[in-house]
């Protein structure tokens, strides 16, 4: 069976790097990279498609390419990378919702990876210094990027309930500006 991976956010460093590495993997037949602007860096081996994940047209990209794995890297930690807080929220939350809707309708998607963040744990003075995956923050994030990723995770959990046939992964890396 052919393996076709769609990676969002390929114009930024981490998304582009991942797409390039996946394209070099012999178990992956094709990598489709999606973003609103063409990458300034090399993504050789990746088929670039200019598309906005906030638009329902992303479903056409997934279906026409026969994508079986979606890796959503287009979650922006810093408002300046998005043009301000409002566009950041739209890209992060609305974009993820549209992408999940497209994956839900898809007949080919079998795996979904959505980049989350350790920011979802919060960082109040009452929180412990170290968290485990099983722990919950004392207070849910109330604003900014941390709230975005908490909302995103909630939508992804809902997707996983509706599509139990799709394997879902939510990695929570520690954020660094260089990884946007």
Which residue ranges define each predicted feature?
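N-terminal Rossmann NAD(P)H-binding glycine-rich loop of SDR-like oxidoreductase domains
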Residues: 2-27
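SDR active-site strand-loop-helix element
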Residues: 8, 34, 70-76, 112-118, ...
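Conserved glycine-rich Rossmann-like NAD(P)H-binding loop of the short-chain dehydrogenase/reductase
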Residues: 27-36
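Rossmann-fold cofactor-recognition segment
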Residues: 43-55
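NAD(P)H-binding glycine-rich loop region in Rossmannoid oxidoreductase-like domains
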Residues: 53-94, 105, 123
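Conserved Rossmann-fold NAD(P)-dependent oxidoreductase catalytic core, especially the SDR/UDP-sugar
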Residues: 97-145, 169
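Active-site Tyr-X1-5-Lys
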Residues: 141-171
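Glycine/proline-rich active-site loop of Rossmann-fold NAD(P)-dependent oxidoreductases
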Residues: 164, 178-180
């Amino acid at each position: 069976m052919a393996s076709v991976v769609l990676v969002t956010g390929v114009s930024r460093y981490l998304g582009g790097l991942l797409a390039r590495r996946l394209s070099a993997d012999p178990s992956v037949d094709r990598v489709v990279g999606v973003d609103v602007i063409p990458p300034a860096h090399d993504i050789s081996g990746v088929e670039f498609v200019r598309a906005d994940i906030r638009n329902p047209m992303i479903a056409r990209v997934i279906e026409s390419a026969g994508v079986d794995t979606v890796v959503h890297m287009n979650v922006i930690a810093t408002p300046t990378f998005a043009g301000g807080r409002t566009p950041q929220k739209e890209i992060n939350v609305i974009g993820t919702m549209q992408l999940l809707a497209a994956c839900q309708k898809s007949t080919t998607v079998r795996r979904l990876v959505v980049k989350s963040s350790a920011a979802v744990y919060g960082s109040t003075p009452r929180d412990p210094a170290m968290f485990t995956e099983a722990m919950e923050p004392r207070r849910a994030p109330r604003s900014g990027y941390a709230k975005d990723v908490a909302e995103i995770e909630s939508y992804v959990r809902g997707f996983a309930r509706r599509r139990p046939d799709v394997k879902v992964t939510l990695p929570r890396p520690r954020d660094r500006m260089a990884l946007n």
